[in-house]
């Protein structure tokens, strides 16, 4: 194609000039929350492996066992021959964990949100165009699903349930079903939704409640299975790639809704089923998570300790209340410089900049893990204070 390289080159040059050109850096995972980058060992405070399950011996062993028993791949989409009997049993286990009638496994969190939401919001299903009320800071995959759906969308101020209710009131005369879309733990700020208040509001307005539990799964709630169980959310999705240490996503919902999604969600219909090794890792993680209450408690204590230390130094950690603690620096250049200074001190903390976060809120997002030691946390806090002081 004529002009392709020139067009792409101009685009990449523009990103470079704006300081926003992303590159991929090879990383070698190591035990105990470490990684090797560019030949150097760093303490990794940017991974979502919150419980360290990606290297847990039971997870690795069951993954290996299912690989040996069922082979390297599922071989087809689930509606053909890729729906393994082991996957059917695994979905029943997920449903029990989430206290729902049924569950459905999909290939990734992005694929889940980007295909389930358009299926749910199909005007042909409801006989009228749905109205969606979404938190302003929901994940890009949720925005993508809503955009693909074409439904009417209204954004409420982040975590502001009063504003949400005012929007529901303002549009009460409009025809069509109501949907509320949000997250229980927000990935960039680390704040936690008041699930009880949100569920009560959804019930008052007869709204379908869709919650993304990607960063709560494994970490929060009774037995570590998130904040949605028992709260009446019509659909809770989550991932296996963070607190559960492997890969993939799930939807927990009613049996009838599961059957509908099997017939309408493109991310399931047209995608090859997850490989057996991944399913085995998920199965083991689900067995382990209820036994890790001590690790979850310690993880939250570590989050409080890091927030307290940073706030005592006058640094901005936003509304964080979880294992995700942002250091909000605002300026993109300074954020990159502090991240580099941390790396020089043996700490991996990735700079998060627009468009991932709003302009003026660039930050380093620290993700804590149960495998980090108290000494690791001491080292992190000291390195942050030193790096910030050295990078005015």
From Swiss-Prot:
Known cofactor(s): pyridoxal 5'-phosphate
Pfam families per UniProt: Aminotran_1_2
Biological pathway: Cofactor biosynthesis; biotin biosynthesis
PROSITE patterns found in the cross-reference section: AA_TRANSFER_CLASS_2
Origin superkingdom: Bacteria
Binding sites annotated in the UniProt record for substrate: 22, 139, 356
Protein purpose: Catalyzes the decarboxylative condensation of pimeloyl-[acyl-carrier protein] and L-alanine to produce 8-amino-7-oxononanoate (AON), [acyl-carrier protein], and carbon dioxide.
Protein name: Putative 8-amino-7-oxononanoate synthase
Organism field: Paramagnetospirillum magneticum (strain ATCC 700264 / AMB-1)
């Amino acid at each position: 194609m004529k002009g392709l390289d020139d067009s792409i080159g101009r685009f990449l040059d523009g990103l470079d000039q704006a300081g926003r050109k992303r590159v991929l850096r090879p990383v070698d995972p190591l035990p105990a929350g470490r990684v090797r980058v560019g030949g150097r060992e760093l303490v990794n405070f940017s991974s979502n492996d919150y419980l360290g399950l990606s290297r847990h011996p039971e997870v690795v062993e069951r993954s290996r066992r299912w690989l040996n028993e069922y082979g390297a791949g599922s071989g087809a989409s689930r509606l053909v021959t890729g729906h393994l009997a082991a996957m059917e049993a695994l979905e029943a286990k997920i449903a029990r964990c989430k206290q729902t009638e049924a569950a459905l496994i999909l290939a990734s969190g992005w694929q889940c949100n980007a295909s389930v939401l358009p299926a749910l919001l199909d005007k042909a299903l409801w006989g009228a165009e749905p109205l969606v009320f979404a938190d302003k800071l929901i994940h890009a995959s949720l925005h993508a699903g809503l955009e693909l759906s074409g439904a009417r969308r209204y954004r409420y101020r982040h975590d502001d349930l009063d504003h949400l209710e005012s929007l529901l009131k303002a549009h009460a005369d409009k025809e069509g079903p109501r949907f509320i879309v949000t997250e229980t733990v927000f990935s960039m700020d680390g704040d936690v939704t008041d699930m009880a208040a949100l569920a009560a509001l959804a019930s008052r307005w007869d709204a379908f409640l869709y919650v993304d539990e990607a960063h709560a799964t494994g970490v929060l709630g009774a037995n570590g299975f998130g904040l949605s169980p028992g709260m009446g959310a019509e659909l809770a999705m989550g991932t296996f790639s963070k607190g559960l240490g492997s890969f993939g996503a799930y939807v927990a919902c009613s049996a009838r809704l599961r059957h509908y999604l099997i017939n309408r969600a493109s991310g399931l219909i047209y995608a090859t089923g997850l490989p057996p090794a991944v399913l085995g890792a998920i199965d083991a993680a689900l067995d382990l998570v209820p036994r890790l209450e001590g690790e979850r408690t310690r993880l939250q204590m570590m989050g409080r300790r890091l927030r307290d230390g940073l706030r005592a130094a006058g640094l901005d950690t936003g509304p964080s209340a979880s294992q995700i603690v942002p250091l909000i620096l605002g300026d993109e250049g300074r954020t990159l410089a502090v991240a580099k200074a941390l790396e020089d001190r043996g700490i991996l903390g990735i700079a998060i900049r627009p468009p991932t976060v709003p302009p003026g809120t660039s930050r380093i997002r620290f993700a804590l893990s149960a495998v980090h030691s108290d000494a690791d946390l001491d080292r992190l806090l000291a390195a942050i204070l030193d790096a910030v002081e050295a990078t005015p």
